[in-house]
Amino acid sequence: MPKCMERKVIMAVRHIDFEEYKNEIVNSDKLVLIDFFATWCGPCKMLSPIIEQVAAEHSDLEVVKVDVDKVPELAVSYNVMSIPTLVFIKGGNLVKQSVGFASKAEIEKMIEECR
């Protein structure tokens, strides 16, 4: 493959299930951003690269994605009724929740508000 065709992909965002949430996310010392999404959701697809970029730029922020079709019990526990929904938790407690598409600037502002 030519050098110009090579791409380094850094996966800063991981998809989690309910067990990972209970074992890792709830007890995290970091501010956690959970992106509730579905593969068929247009606004979720538009938001995904922004979430990846935010995660890559904030090493002090834990960023995870939850597919509401695969982990509905977690979506229900946060009363997620529409997607995309962004949930910020700290020390296991809900700090902020945002429903609908958000720009990078809006997400950056939410991060600062939650710190």
Walk through the language-model features, giving the residues of each.
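Conserved redox-active cysteine motifs that mediate thiol-disulfide chemistry
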Residues: 36-50
